[in-house]
A protein has these predicted regions:
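Phosphate-handling catalytic cores of nucleic-acid transaction enzymes
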Residues: 1-184
Length: 184
């Protein structure tokens, strides 16, 4: 073992089965505590954001007189799960949740197909880098500033049908090591 070697337990997992083989229900059951946690966090965020908006609607003088911060910070929604998301959106959410995230996709075929949704394959490269916990830098004109995540921690889990999986592993995915990173 090398002294300075560091690995993250990032997992990409897929439950494989026939259509109607009851793949989704066990996964939903296992994720229920995470869903409940994220729901409670979202409820708290909604309250904090309503208070933030109320505070921001006040003038600076009114905030000072009320003993509030002159420039209050917007609340952050804490979460563990994400679903249908772009790499840019994921980077923003991960920056707000540095302990890590899990992409939960009931049908992983949608995740695979999204790799070319906005551009030509760079999303697959993003996921190859994330698996190895390599730094991600998101510089897009639609974002207010650059997002730098030194050591991303994003796991992926979902279900897929055997026939669809066979179609998705054709081409570069089988030669660039992407498919090898998924536990089936």
């Amino acid at each position: 073992v090398k002294r300075n070697w560091l690995e993250s337990p990032i997992l990409y997992m897929a439950l494989i089965g026939r259509p109607g083989a009851n793949k989704s229900h066990p996964l939903s059951f296992a994720f229920q505590p995470f869903i409940e946690h994220d729901y409670c966090q979202n409820q708290e965020y909604q309250k904090l954001y309503a208070e933030y908006e109320r505070t921001m609607s006040m003038s600076k003088k009114e905030r000072m007189e009320a003993g509030l911060d002159e420039f209050p910070k917007a609340p952050v929604r804490r979460r563990f799960l994400v679903s249908d998301i772009t790499p840019e959106g994921l980077s923003l959410i991960h920056a707000q949740n540095p302990r890590g995230l899990c992409l939960w996709s009931d049908e992983l075929s949608a995740w695979f197909k999204n790799f070319n949704r906005y551009n030509n394959g760079s999303e697959e490269q993003f996921w190859l880098s994330v698996f190895n916990a390599k730094p991600t830098i998101s510089d897009r004109k639609s974002t207010q500033s650059s997002i730098f995540i030194r050591r991303p921690y994003i796991s992926v889990i979902g279900t897929i049908q055997k026939k669809i999986l066979g179609e998705l592993v054709k081409g570069e995915r089988s030669s660039n090591g992407f498919i090898d990173r998924i536990l089936f």
